[in-house]
From Swiss-Prot:
Protein name in UniProt: Leucine--tRNA ligase
Subcellular location field: Cytoplasm
Organism: Escherichia coli O139:H28 (strain E24377A / ETEC)
Organism ancestry: Bacteria, Pseudomonadati, Pseudomonadota, Gammaproteobacteria, Enterobacterales
Presence of the UniProt keyword Aminoacyl-tRNA synthetase in the record: yes
Short sequence motif 'KMSKS' region: positions: 619-623
């Protein structure tokens, strides 16, 4: 064994061994308990970042640990390869998205291998290949036949200059990110999947997910947004149709003083025919992108349509306004306004001088003061005719019942969740498998024409999708009849909604899933990824699982038993102010810093001498130039060091602060482990451990070893507090480094301890552990070694540590049996060499003994 720890030599050797032996390739085995460990698949952006490294290290630690418990562990990896960034990169680099994507996959695959992750590479998939997306296309046509897919016009962001649709994030301050043209709202036909048909099940089954974070479940509950209320119909004077609104507060209905409709509502459109002010307002609304998040904070505007609705219970005429806070895509596009008891309605009514009528008493039973704001709390009714004196629940039911009896109301359960719009007017995605015949009939692409293959050899102009720009691509025939293919592609969330299931049978050619394999591996035992996916991906992921279950492909209700959301990786961020006042961000690697005695940064400059402003720790990002390249760190310290730091620096679900000093600390620790094994093995063969012949000190050390095994097992397996597991191993290592190694049993005990340490570290730092296991002559490869088991007998406290003082000063510590007498303790103290030298040639005048704790010898 070489004396120095050289990760650059051992890591590539061990990785080659795993590749050649196909160590992590698995198949279904009914005789073994399965464990499916999955990290969210990466987008092949070109290079791994530290967020990836953290996510995949957590997954690998769990997978390797479960494997050592004897389970059949599946840990696959693949590439979420479609998406907009590839289009931008292709235009910029004068290439096509496909070659750019495949080059990135090849590069990042090498980076993943360099980090030593134990993936089953035989199952690798890229979602941009026809072999993958063909099954998604087929499934979509099946959903269409079941009535779960439909097409309707929907508002999108439209750039009139580029003649293209923009995603919300491509609209910056109301303008196109590419050409700065003012963006318009445009209605275009789009495909939708009926996720609302599963709203109740998606909501109720959250209660089955005991091992998902509460934050994620709450976000999904709120996103689905189930509410119970009443749908109410109003007659409108001089208008051919009625107006329907939905309210969750029918108890406030007697305080409704106006209605508001969306600018795109047919009533507003009709009123605008003779109202230029309203027409201009509608125009303004059409060109304003309103994300739901902005609705609460934006200025509320409106115009009176001139129409009057009739309150069904009071008979009063109330005005109908067009307002910018009502959206056509939500509910009926009309809302009832109760300004006395809703703050938004109150602000709008105050602004435009509309009637504000209180109908709920304050908590103390007095009439509410509405001079400053609405009273939004529930309470007892007044000013409400026959409903006066009723509390919230009684009033809700009484008014709902009355409206229902009159035929103008209906109790309804509503959802905030909208159907999933899966059309994208982009090129780099899976083509939507639908065709339109000459007579306008729309139908699914026939099975014998699937997959509809996306051409990869294309020229990108950065504006129009190549398949939209090429009329020939869309031409096809169905049963001899000319037809046109759909030129929209799927939302890329489609591919990531079912990849986890395809990993169970990536080569299967008879259909989307091989049910036998899928039902052996599914559900996923632990799914690891960022909390930013809480509502979109993780909701579609659950939805798709239920769709596949109802198609008879899987037999479970939920895709993943446990969800672990890892924290973000933060790093120091620095900038200097340029000549024009702009901020130039400088990588922390290039910052020369001065720190105070507490280690805080007080001054910084770069190599060019710029004074740097330190903005603290923030999420690693391109915009702040504070990302640390994992590859550079692996080349500098080795993959094991980077992995160990990632798992030690912070609990997995908390933010992690990147500190190179911490990385250096992890590296020093691994060098100490290497050194201890080197020194131990250099002394030759080891005798068998005789547990019955151990001294008290040896028993105490062995107790520490087995207590550490018990703690680390619990920390990794149950608590998933990986940082505390590593801390416990480090603490044990400190004790082993000080332990005597002269006697035969000392060395036998050290052998047992080191074999345990190397196995406990193996999930975190597999390369060094693979090598040290061989040096310690462990049986077989460590990848197939069992996890160490704590010996209950060894952990029994049959001895205790007594502090020995001479004249009140601590001179040593001794281990004695729990039931040792004072005489035995004194005798043992005399044998301890650190104490003995203070007793040489002196007389013990007095002995103070605190049983099992302290022995103070007063000498003179």
């Amino acid at each position: 064994m070489q004396e120095q720890y050289r990760p650059e030599e051992i890591e590539s050797k061990v990785q080659l061994h795993w590749d050649e032996k196909r160590t992590f390739e698995v198949t279904e085995d009914e005789s073994k308990e399965k464990y499916y460990c999955l990290s969210m698949l990466p987008y092949p952006s070109g290079r791994l970042h530290m967020g990836h490294v953290r996510n995949y290290t957590i997954g690998d630690v769990i997978a390797r640990y479960q494997r050592m418990l004897g389970k059949n562990v599946l840990q696959p990896i693949g590439w979420d390869a479609f998406g907009l960034p590839a289009e931008g990169a292709a235009v910029k680099n004068n290439t096509a998205p496909a070659p750019w994507t495949y080059d990135n996959i090849a590069y990042m695959k090498n980076q993943l291998k360099m980090l030593g992750f134990g993936y089953d590479w035989s199952r690798e998939l890229a979602t941009c290949t026809p072999e993958y997306y063909r099954w998604e296309q087929k499934f979509f046509t099946e959903l269409y036949k079941k009535g779960l897919v439909y097409k309707k016009t929907s508002a999108v962001n439209w750039c009139p200059n580029d003649q293209t649709v923009l995603a919300n994030e491509q609209v910056i301050d109301g303008c196109c990110w590419r050409c700065d043209t003012k963006v318009e709202r445009k209605e275009i036909p789009q495909w939708f999947i009926k996720i609302t048909a599963y709203a109740d099940e998606l909501l109720n089954d959250l209660d089955k997910l005991d091992h998902w974070p509460d934050t994620v479940k709450t976000m999904q509950r709120n996103w689905i947004g189930r509410s119970e209320g009443v749908e109410i119909t109003f007659n409108v004077n001089d208008y051919d149709n009625t107006l329907t609104v939905y309210t969750t507060r029918p108890d406030t209905f007697m305080g409704c003083t106006y209605l508001a409709v969306a600018a795109g509502h047919p009533l507003a459109q009709k009123a605008a025919e003779n109202n230029p002010e309203l027409a201009a307002f509608i125009d303004e609304c059409r060109n304003t992108k309103v994300a739901e998040a902005e609705m609460a904070t934006m200025e509320k505007k409106g115009v009176d349509t001139g129409f009057k609705a009739v309150h069904p219970l009071t008979g009063e005429e109330i005005p109908v306004w067009a307002a910018n806070f009502v959206l056509m895509e939500y509910g009926t596009g009309a809302v009832m306004a109760v300004p006395g008891h809703d703050q938004r309605d109150y602000e709008f009514a105050s602004k435009y001088g509309l009637n504000i009528k209180p109908v709920i008493l304050a908590a103390d039973g007095s009439e509410p003061d509405l001079s400053q704001q609405a009273l939004t709390e529930k309470g007892v009714l007044f000013n409400s005719g026959e409903f006066n004196g009723l509390d919230h629940e009684a009033a809700f039911n009484a008014i709902a019942d009355k409206l229902t009896a009159m035929g103008v109301g209906e109790r309804k359960v509503n959802y905030r969740l909208r159907d999933w719009g899966v059309s994208r007017q982009r090129y780099w995605g899976a083509p939507i498998p639908m065709v339109t015949l000459e007579d306008g009939t729309v139908m699914p692409t026939p099975d014998d024409q699937l997959p509809v293959i996306l051409p990869e050899d294309v020229v990108m102009d950065g504006i129009t999708s190549p398949i939209k720009a090429d009329p020939e691509w869309a031409k096809t025939t169905v049963n001899g009849i000319p037809a046109l293919r759909e030129t929209d592609t799927f939302d890329t969330f489609m591919e990531s909604s079912w990849y986890y299931a395809r990993y169970t049978c990536p080569e299967y050619k008879e259909g989307m899933l091989d049910s036998k394999a899928a039902n052996y591996w599914l559900p996923v035992d632990i799914y690891i990824g960022g909390i930013e996916h809480a509502i979109m991906h993780l909701l579609y992921f659950r939805f798709f699982h239920k769709l596949m279950r109802d198609a008879g492909m899987v037999n479970s209700d939920e895709p993943a038993k446990q969800l672990l959301c890892q924290g973000m990786v933060l790093a120091d961020a620095f900038y200097y102010v340029g000549e024009n006042g702009e901020r130039n961000w400088v990588s922390p690697v290039d910052a020369i810093v001065e720190r105070d005695e507490k280690g805080r940064i007080v001054k910084a400059k770069d190599a060019a001498g710029h004074e740097l402003v330190y903005t603290g720790m923030s999420k690693m990002s391109k915009s702040k130039n504070n990302g640390i390249d994992p590859q550079v760190m692996v080349e500098r310290y080795g993959a094991d060091t980077v992995r160990l730091f990632m798992m030690f620096a912070s609990p997995a679900d908390m933010t992690l602060e990147w500190q190179e000093s911490g990385v250096e600390g992890a590296n020093r620790f691994l060098k100490r482990v290497w050194k201890l094994v080197y020194e131990h093995t250099a002394k030759g063969d080891v005798a068998a451990l005789n547990v019955d012949a151990l001294t008290e000190d040896q028993k105490a050390l062995r107790r520490d070893v087995h207590k550490t095994i018990a703690k680390v097992t619990d920390d990794i397996g149950r608590r998933q507090t990986f940082n505390t597991a590593i801390a416990a191993i480090m603490e044990l290592m400190n004790k082993l480094a000080k332990a005597p190694t002269d006697g035969e049993q000392d060395r036998a005990l050290m052998q047992e301890a080191l074999l345990a340490v190397v196995r406990m570290l193996n999930p975190f730092t597999p390369h060094i552990c693979f090598t040290l296991w061989q040096e310690l002559k462990g049986e077989g490869d460590i990848d197939n070694a069992p996890w160490p088991v704590a010996d209950e007998k060894a952990m029994v406290e049959d001895s205790t540590l007594v502090v020995v003082q001479v004249n009140g000063k601590v001179r040593g510590k001794i281990t004695v049996p729990v039931d040792a007498t004072e005489e035995q303790v004194r005798e043992r103290a005399g044998q301890e060499h650190l104490v003995a030298k203070y007793l040489d040639g002196v007389t013990v005048r007095k002995v103070i003994y605190v049983p099992g704790k302290l022995l103070n010898l007063v000498v003179g």
